[in-house]
Amino acid sequence: MQDIYGTLANLNTKLKQKLSHPYLAKHISAPKIDEDKLLLFHALFEEADIKNNDRENYIVTAMLVQSALDTHDEVTTARVIKRDENKNRQLTVLAGDYFSGLYYSLLSEMKDIYMIRTLATAIKEINEHKIRLYDRSFKDENDFFESVGIVESALFHRVAEHFNLPRWKKLSSDFFVFKRLMNGNDAFLDVIGSFIQLGKTKEEILEDCFKKAKNSIESLLPLNSPIQNILINRLKTISQDQTYHQKVEEG
């Protein structure tokens, strides 16, 4: 298991180097790296039939796309903002575009036009479903969870299809839907609250998502494998952290 953590630390360092830009660093916060997504991309690409020399580039590339998407999400939609805030907003958009350009550059160097198409398709799907969540145009509970799953894991879905590794589609979706709901802001949780009329509380819905993610990890990954143990522990940590924060806020 120590080897996994060492590999992830190395990937994290290389990703930060790619994401580093001296001018942007002066004006906006460094992009946050989702270490759970880094872990799952590492595990997925470990199973892919690709050269060892290319594996690291694929992982970094996928995470650059994720960073670009996350950075664009940081852009404020407020109409009235101060001059300095407007500059930060413009630079945040620029940063997201810059990170997108990096992934195109890496894949073009590898001459992998098919992966460019794969990631572009995922980006299109993610943006479409972000709009659905933003304007609440989903029809029902299933529609809502489908959109959350696509926003959080479409990159994994498309990459898994590209390399014919179907189990990572369900596993990534179940895990990241749970994580997104646990880390959601008040507005996001209010959407969940609208489903209470179906006879479930927010807590029961979150518990169902936890069990679903845990079941996927236990049934789709080798028993007691390092990646299975790490993901089970992460699920528990995410759940415990949120419970702790709720208790603190409630006093």
Swiss-Prot record:
GO MF assignments: heptaprenyl diphosphate synthase activity; transferase activity, transferring alkyl or aryl (other than methyl) groups
This enzyme's EC code(s): 2.5.1.30
Keyword annotations of the record: Isoprene biosynthesis, Sporulation, Transferase
Catalytic activity: 4 isopentenyl diphosphate + (2E,6E)-farnesyl diphosphate = all-trans-heptaprenyl diphosphate + 4 diphosphate
A GO biological process held by the record: menaquinone biosynthetic process
Pfam families assigned: HEPPP_synt_1
Keyword Amino-acid biosynthesis: no
Gene3D superfamilies registered for this protein in UniProt: 1.20.120.1450
InterPro entries: HEPPP_synth_su1
Function: Supplies heptaprenyl diphosphate, the precursor for the side chain of the isoprenoid quinone menaquinone-7 (MQ-7).
Subunit record text: Heterodimer of component I and II.
Name of the protein this chain belongs to: Heptaprenyl diphosphate synthase component 1
Species annotation: Bacillus subtilis (strain 168)
The encoding gene: hepS
